[in-house]
Amino acid sequence: MRGRGSRDTGTQSAAFASRPVRTTVDMQAQRAPLMEVKRNLELSTTLVKSSSRLPLPGSRLKRGPDQMEDGLEPAKKRTRGMGTVTKVDTSRPRGPPLSAVSTAAQKGPRKTGPRGCSAVGPVLRNQKPAPAAPAQKPGTSTAPAVAGKKPGKRPAWDLKGQLCDLHEELKQYREKTQTLDRENQGLREQLREVQEQATTLGTERNTLEEELASVRRRAEQSQQKLETLGARVLELEECLGTKERLVQELQTERLQLQEERSTLSTQLEEREREFQASEAALSSSRAEVLCLRQKTAAQVTLLAEQGDRLYGLEMERRRLHNQLQELKGNIRVFCRVRPVLEGESTPSPGFLVFPPGPAGPSDPPTRLCLSRSDDRRSTLTRAPAAATRHDFSFDRVFPPGSKQEEVFEEISMLVQSALDGYPVCIFAYGQTGSGKTFTMEGGPRGDPQLEGLIPRAMRHLFSVAQEMSGQGWTYSFVASYVEIYNETVRDLLATGTRKGQGGDCEIRRAGPGSEELTVTNARYVPVSCEKEVEALLHLAQQNRAVARTAQNERSSRSHSVFQLQISGEHAARGLQCGAPLNLVDLAGSERLDPGLTLGPGERDRLRETQAINSSLSTLGLVIMALSNKESHVPYRNSKLTYLLQNSLGGSAKMLMFVNISPLEENVSESLNSLRFASKVNQCVIGTAQANKK
């Protein structure tokens, strides 16, 4: 049996070695027989290890007290050799003989289970233990009857017969014991074979479990790899779709490029023909360029000569321009009559007459006739006295219909003198409401026809400076705007917290030994365009001191001085020039009414009027002193004359606008203004000198 089991085990091992790897379901199917074999082995081990109930050899059956008593009774003794031997039941189930088990194992049907499973397992599983024989009472015997007779019970005194029976029974028990030992030995060998087979099957099971775990790991790896490959396939499919679209786009682009190439090839051929023609033209042009270079060199030489000549002509122009201005007079007076405003009474005919010039009606007027009626009557006829006629002659008279542009044309030559390096000062003088501020600054913003002298002069200077840059001249402009109120200098360009701090402004020399004057704490703003000047004028209008007077609802109560410092340089010739342009809007000149009742507001107006008249009187005295060539000129008697002293002397050019009202009710103030202007017009302050370096 051991050899056959070994061969079966080898066959089964070879079968397992050559068997393909099965799934988990097959492995579970293989485990079921193995578990049954294990259970049968445990049952067999229990049967083998169960204790035998056979009597030990050489031992004697002990009797109890009841049996001893029965043996003492003579009536119950049996005759020796006539009774049956009592059989001891071991109550041990007997299994089938080993030969039957082996035969059943060999001839039993072979199951379709996994290979390597022996048939011993089913045999042991289906074998049932034999039912134990019922225990017999002591003294009874189960031995068969002798000679066909039913054996009787030996009497108690037949000890020898009983002993023989016991020996016979012991012999039978020994034979049974030997038989059981042989069967036990066979079962032990069979158990050993089954255990070896179980060990082999366990080893194979472990091997299969390891193979199964390996297969599972490989399956998981394959699944992961499959998922990775699936994702890669999707990615590649998406990439393939993108590549296909790109290929389609490239094919479309290729077709377009082919068309463009065809077009470019055609154009290239045309360009080659044009290039050949251009080369021929270039050869011709080179010859022309050579000729033109020679001509250019000649033109450069001529241009330099023309530049020198132009510079000489510019210097001659300046000299003649200045000579013309001197012939007109370094102090000139223009009279301007403002038009009648809406709501004012129209003057009577003949009140203001503008006689034509010497050349006739086409000649601009230079005279003004003002008629003044007298309330006195003749003592003889008691008739009204004739009107008094006052004639005045000036350098130019502007009637009420004159436009701002006409006024500026007359002073544009004077503004040009400032650019040439001559100090220039232009005044606007007259009573309150006569149009001084309108003449200097203009009307409402946004209407170019109403622009005053200041914005027009700045536009003219910027334009001429731009033209002069072509001749090598560069100009810079620095503007300031101050007012003199009650002999106090205020900065009209102050902003923020500096507003109203005009008292801190003082007139000082620019430096030790310098004749140039400057105003401390005042803003000096570089300007280069008209918009910057407009912004400064708008700011000054907001800061200027105004008040209500008897002549005007909103009257300027201070002298405003717009100063523009002009600096020019010709770097190529090393020339420099500089001069100030002063545009002054004087405060209204009015006489005080002796019978005026003074209230709190009238006292302020009184002080303002006194300061204004004092400064205007000083201005007249300064002009007279300059005209008379006096050694002392009272510049310091007024802040106005002290600030303008460099523009009032013999090296300066001065022009005064006398503005008068067309109303008859203002005839007294108009006559006073005209008389003052006539005195100024009669003054001569000498020849002006340009400030050149």
Swiss-Prot record:
Subcellular location: Nucleus; Cytoplasm, Cytoskeleton, Microtubule organizing center, Centrosome; Cytoplasm, Cytoskeleton, Spindle; Early endosome
GO molecular function list: ATP binding; ATP hydrolysis activity; microtubule binding; microtubule motor activity; minus-end-directed microtubule motor activity
Gene3D superfamilies in the record: 1.10.287.1490, Kinesin motor domain (3.40.850.10)
InterPro entries for this protein: Kinesin-like_fam (IPR027640), Kinesin_motor_CS (IPR019821), Kinesin_motor_dom (IPR001752), Kinesin_motor_dom_sf (IPR036961), P-loop_NTPase (IPR027417)
Region feature (Disordered): 1-24, 48-156
Coiled coil (residue ranges): 165-334
Phosphothreonine modifications at: T379
Alphabetical keyword list: ATP-binding, Cell cycle, Cell division, Coiled coil, Cytoplasm, Cytoskeleton, Endosome, Microtubule, Mitosis, Motor protein, Nucleotide-binding, Nucleus, Phosphoprotein
Top-rank lineage group of the source organism: Eukaryota
Low complexity composition bias: residue spans: 49-59, 127-138
UniProt GO BP: cell division; microtubule-based movement; minus-end-directed vesicle transport along microtubule; mitotic metaphase chromosome alignment; mitotic spindle assembly; negative regulation of centrosome duplication; spermatogenesis; vesicle transport along microtubule
CDD domains attached to this UniProt entry: KISc_C_terminal (cd01366)
Binding-site positions, ATP: G430, Q431, T432, G433, S434, G435, K436, T437
Pfam family, one: Kinesin
GO cellular component terms listed in the entry, alphabetical order: cytoplasm; early endosome; endocytic vesicle; kinesin complex; microtubule; microtubule organizing center; mitotic spindle; nucleus
SMART domains recorded: KISc (SM00129)
Keyword Phosphoprotein attached: yes
Residues carrying Phosphoserine: S52, S59
Domain Kinesin motor: 330-683
Main location: nucleus
Subunit description: Binds NUBP1 and NUBP2. Interacts with PPP1R42.
Reported function: Minus end-directed microtubule-dependent motor required for bipolar spindle formation. May contribute to movement of early endocytic vesicles. Regulates cilium formation and structure.
PANTHER family: KINESIN-LIKE PROTEIN KLP-3 (PTHR47972), PROTEIN CLARET SEGREGATIONAL (PTHR47972:SF45)
Protein family (similarity comment): Belongs to the TRAFAC class myosin-kinesin ATPase superfamily. Kinesin family. NCD subfamily.
Protein name: Kinesin-like protein KIFC1
Source organism phylogeny: Eukaryota, Metazoa, Chordata, Craniata, Vertebrata
